[in-house]
């Protein structure tokens, strides 16, 4: 069987693989074959993912996630920023004038590791995002309330949401 490719920077690999080595290495511990194939990526350097639909180039950028970092991704003029409470200065230039931004908005009140709705809306406006989809929303962000009260260029996401983009 073919392993599922996963893309990890050095820091993520250092933390993840020792905990889940049985997923990456044919195992003495588990007796099962490995299911994941590590592909090492470097922050702020593009990498290409190939699939049945062709190739897509991704650029990983650094985000703040409380006292640790997380990685956001930009591809074409789209960014994905989950598990984020702030951005490192080096990452900011990748956020301007996006066509789409899929971005964290956990709840109404501030949280130590996830951005809250007001902050997310400020970023969307500041960076002049054309269309944003909120993700990682907690139960206190009511979907219908958000539909009625968000700016026209911002929508709450939902499970199985999909939309077409030109690549």
Where on the chain are the PLM-derived regions?
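Short active-site oxyanion
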Residues: 2-5, 77, 129-131
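Core dinuclear metal-dependent hydrolase active-site scaffold
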Residues: 34-90, 159-167
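Binuclear metal-ion centers of metallo-dependent hydrolases, dominated by the metallo-beta-lactamase
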Residues: 44, 88-167
């Amino acid at each position: 069987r073919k392993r599922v490719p996963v893309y990890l920077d050095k820091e993520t690999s250092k933390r993840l693989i020792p905990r889940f080595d049985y997923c990456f290495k044919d195992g003495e511990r588990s007796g099962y074959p490995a299911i994941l194939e590590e592909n090492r990526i470097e922050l702020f350097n593009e990498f290409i993912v190939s699939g049945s639909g062709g190739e897509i180039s991704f650029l990983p950028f650094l985000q703040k996630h409380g006292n640790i970092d997380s990685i956001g991704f930009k591809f074409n003029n789209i960014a994905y920023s989950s598990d984020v409470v702030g951005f490192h200065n080096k990452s900011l230039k990748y956020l301007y004038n996006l066509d789409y931004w899929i971005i964290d908005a956990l709840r109404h009140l501030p949280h130590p590791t996830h951005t809250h709705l007001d902050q997310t809306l400020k970023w969307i406006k500041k960076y002049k995002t054309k269309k944003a989809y909120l993700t990682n929303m907690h139960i206190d962000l009511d979907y219908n309330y958000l539909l009625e009260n968000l700016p026209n260029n911002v929508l709450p996401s939902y499970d199985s949401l999909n939309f077409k983009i030109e690549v």
